[in-house]
């Protein structure tokens, strides 16, 4: 059973569940506002840092959906039981725009494996295009939790192309989360139309 989560400026969309971020203001509002501000956008370093910060915030939210197992740690006083993430996480991104967001996720999931895909639009004419994938580096995804990120979910075609090629090279993950910072309805709909949770084990 595969789970797809989409984070954008308005909501976290989780198949079967919709969370409206506007109902609960968070620090993400500030980061998103600066990302969209035409003046602040000119500061490349701040733009990248805000993407990284959003990746960190998203990691915290995503961690609530993962599987945990009880483990033991030796403290200075005694042995303590703690709940630790039991999922094997693989962080994947679409080069190169996704790197700052990927880094934010990696800052929290610091023991995760990494995967990279190079995907771009190859225009056939002024309005039609196809997605070209020229590079992929991917570990085994079998039975693991895949987190695939790209800052902008526009048409959704690049995201689906990246997901399909990752699965073709690494196998089917146990769970998949798709993370974007900004998205449009068309892209969300495209992702939902081209994924079937019941077929992804």
Feature-to-residue mapping (PLM):
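Short, basic, low-complexity termini and linkers enriched in Ser/Thr/Gly/Pro
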Residues: 1-12
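PRPP-associated nucleotide enzymes
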Residues: 12-201
């Amino acid at each position: 059973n595969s789970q797809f989560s989409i984070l954008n400026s308005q909501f976290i969309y989780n198949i079967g569940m919709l969370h409206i971020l506007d109902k609960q203001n968070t620090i993400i509002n500030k980061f998103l506002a600066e990302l969209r501000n035409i003046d602040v956008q000119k500061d490349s370093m701040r733009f990248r840092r805000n993407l990284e910060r959003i990746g960190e915030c998203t990691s915290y939210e995503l961690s609530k959906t993962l599987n945990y197992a009880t483990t033991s740690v030796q403290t200075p006083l005694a042995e303590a039981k703690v709940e630790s993430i039991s999922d094997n996480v693989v962080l994947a991104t679409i080069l190169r725009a996704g790197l700052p967001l990927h880094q934010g996720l990696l800052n929290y999931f610091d023991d995760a494996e990494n995967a990279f895909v190079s995907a771009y639009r190859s225009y056939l004419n002024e309005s039609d295009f196809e997605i070209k994938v020229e590079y992929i580096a991917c570990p085994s995804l079998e039975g693991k939790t895949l987190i695939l990120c790209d800052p902008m979910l526009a048409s959704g075609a690049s995201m689906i192309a990246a997901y399909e090629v990752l699965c073709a090279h690494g196998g089917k993950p146990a769970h998949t989360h798709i993370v974007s910072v900004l998205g449009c309805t068309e892209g969300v709909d495209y992702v939902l139309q081209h994924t079937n949770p019941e077929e992804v084990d």
